[in-house]
Amino acid sequence: MQNSKKIIPVLILIGLICLPIVQFFGNYNYVIHMVLFCFLYITMSSSWNIIGGYGGFISIGHNVFFGIGAYFSGFIYARYGISPFYTAVFAGLIATVFGFGVGLITLRVKGPSFIISSIALLMIFRTLFDRWELVGGAHGITLPHNNLSVEWSKIPHYYALLVLMVLSIFLSWYVRHSKFGLALRSISHDEIKSEVTGINIKIIKVTAYAISAYMIGAAGAIWGDYLTYVRPNIFFIILIAANMVLMCILGGK
């Protein structure tokens, strides 16, 4: 039984790696698109689960980092021609740094107050990027198409998001089984008792918030390139964060 639990994920991963082979037998772009879409949300929900599931802080504005990653890589690509496949790592880092700063401010409150503050953050960024002419304002940034044929144009993004999905699942698993994750879950149950035991609750919460932002930012970079445009009304909408929350609620922590 234990061996089967280890083998099944490996078999699924092998199947996902081999899936694009179907393109040799016809145009299965829609299938590839839907699987790729699943990769995106698994990546983001696994990352959100670190702060929302383990930490107990329900962030309804977490796709701010999705937009930051998309805009960072999109701007670099449009201005300097450096592909988001190279800058996604740095997009994640930018999102992490920003997440740390935001966490220092918003994580001072909890419960409904934190939820409201996360929604307010999303609204602020939607308004900011709607009016920021440097990045195209409400029209956003249009990115170049790749030179691959229609049948194969999605495949680079497919594998990029597959890698991010695997890494985000592993990161979530690793956090859960680490001392850091134990402290984080302790805080979610009772902050006062956790602090009494010597846990630095401020650092733990802010670090968890920043870690959860990384993969979401990197995913935003790849998704922006996949769409070939980055706009506020696509990346800074509450529906994206709501989907992350629902996936974690329905799928479990």
Could you describe each region identified by the protein language model?
Residues L121-E151, G181:
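Extracellular/periplasmic helix-loop junction at the C-terminal end of a transmembrane helix
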Residues M1-T43, F72, R79-T87:
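Membrane-interfacial amphipathic/re-entrant helices at transmembrane-helix boundaries
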Residues F37, Y41, A70-Y71, G92-T96, ...:
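Residue-level recognition of pore/gate-forming positions within transmembrane alpha-helices
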Residues N27-R79, I105-F114, I187-V196, N200, ...:
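Single transmembrane alpha-helix segments in multi-pass membrane proteins
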Residues N63, V89, V206-K253:
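Transmembrane alpha-helical segments in multi-pass inner-membrane proteins
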Residues K154-R231:
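Helix-loop-helix "hairpin" substructures at the membrane interface of multi-pass membrane proteins
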Residues S46, I50, A88, G92, ...:
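Hydrophobic positions within alpha-helical transmembrane segments of bacterial inner-membrane proteins
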Residues V64-F65, V102-R131, F235-I249:
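Pore- or pathway-lining transmembrane helices of multi-pass membrane proteins that form conduits
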